[in-house]
Amino acid sequence: MNRDTSPDLHYLSGFGNEFASEALPGALPVGQNSPQKAPYGLYAELLSGTAFTMARSELRRTWLYRIRPSALHPRFERLARQPLSGPLGGINPNRLRWSPQPIPAEPTDFIEGWLPMVANAAAEKPAGVSIYIYRANRSMERVFFNADGELLLVPEQGRLRIATELGVMEVEPLEIAVIPRGMKFRVELLDGQARGYIAENHGAPLRIPDLGPIGSNGLANPRDFLTPVAHYEEAEAPVQLVQKFLGEHWACELQHSPLDVVAWHGSNVPYKYDLRRFNTIGTVSFDHPDPSIFTVLTSPTSVHGLANMDFVIFPPRWMVAENTFRPPWFHRNLMNEFMGLINGAYDAKAEGFLPGGASLHGVMSAHGPDAETCEKAIAADLAPHKIDNTMAFMFETSQVLRPSLQALECPQLQADYDSCWATLPSTFNPNRR
């Protein structure tokens, strides 16, 4: 069991484990899942994150032992205030970049502040990704669950205290959190306001990638993923329960807290990970390896090696390659790249890409270091140096990402993004090799 920065929070260590946790001694049944009478008069309930008949190594399910079953709720009604959504923007092959989105002035909780940026599938599809930027300036008083997909949260500003059915975790910038599809949770702001990124994964649950020839260690090590221990609320007071279903918000009112799980066991769990613990792999000879070596989590498809989504980071690291153009190379990619920046600067862009901002390079969209970065890299003294105080990341998808109407029409869209490559000179000389 691990203790995080908050003295009242404890975590279980590991990834893909069969965890077990109880807030009261003996609350977990012994030797079976659904006894006739569960300890303490609790109800047994199964939360399935995958189909029953998946391979055992890929199953995600958790047994919950709770004060009241989730079935105890009235009819859901569609909320008058709906999330920003609507049809995706028209076909647009251009490279796009956005400045940071402002945090709203009006009171906005976590689920009210989602700005849809890009997506590649409707919520009911069994694969695909929708990407948002969240902004909030007040804590949630209601409870939320997302029927449309698994949520990967990447804070850029402000710490979050996330109370889930399975326990409580705190997440700060340079950490991430993953919340399974359908799990109820509430987000409280520890710093007054918050901003960050969300990848809503409609496909196979995220997992750590295979390491191949890297071996048995490296990248995101399983022991650094932390799942909260059991914690329950026994409050009997009105609370709104909101669900996101096919992109819409529907709600009902309960007379009790739905975060009332006293004990649980299983593998369908929320977790957090500190990106500063990523064991970065890179060249110690020449050339710039493929960015797949920076993959933290992946959602696979049925095609081996082709991801529904990869979550990739560009952390602090030493650059030592000899006789090498060290920034990320110029590229035209089969995959689609949505990038964000948590802090510092990205080594391929000298200006214009700011923390809280974003960029989109779609399939076969030519991209690479800007003119200033390129000029400096060609002339650089190739002594070892460290890229420090930075954390950029990428959501990379196999299906084409299409920007939302809101993303295309917002004032933060940089109209002059293409100009960062406009002054790249031709240095070709057929008489000099």
UniProtKB/Swiss-Prot annotation:
- Organism lineage string: Bacteria, Pseudomonadati, Pseudomonadota, Gammaproteobacteria, Pseudomonadales
- UniProt xrefs under InterPro entries: HgmA_C, HgmA_N, Homogentis_dOase, Homogentis_dOase_bac, RmlC-like_jellyroll, RmlC_Cupin_sf
User: What is the annotated quaternary arrangement, including any partners?
Assistant: Hexamer; dimer of trimers.
Q: Which residues bind Fe cation?
A: 331, 337, 367
Name of the gene this protein is made from: hmgA
Q: In which pathway does it act?
A: Amino-acid degradation; L-phenylalanine degradation; acetoacetate and fumarate from L-phenylalanine: step 4/6
Q: Which NCBIfam families match?
A: hmgA
Q: Which UniProt keywords apply?
A: Dioxygenase, Iron, Metal-binding, Oxidoreductase, Phenylalanine catabolism, Tyrosine catabolism
Per the UniProt entry, what are the Gene Ontology biological process annotations, in alphabetical order? Answer: L-phenylalanine catabolic process; tyrosine catabolic process
Specify whether Metal-binding is a keyword of the entry: yes
Cofactor names: Fe cation
By sequence similarity, the record places it as follows: Belongs to the homogentisate dioxygenase family.
Please tell me whether the keyword Oxidoreductase is annotated for this protein.
Answer: yes
| Protein's UniProt name | Homogentisate 1,2-dioxygenase
Which cellular component terms (GO) are annotated to the entry?
cytoplasm
What job does this protein perform?
A: Involved in the catabolism of homogentisate (2,5-dihydroxyphenylacetate or 2,5-OH-PhAc), a central intermediate in the degradation of phenylalanine and tyrosine. Catalyzes the oxidative ring cleavage of the aromatic ring of homogentisate to yield maleylacetoacetate.
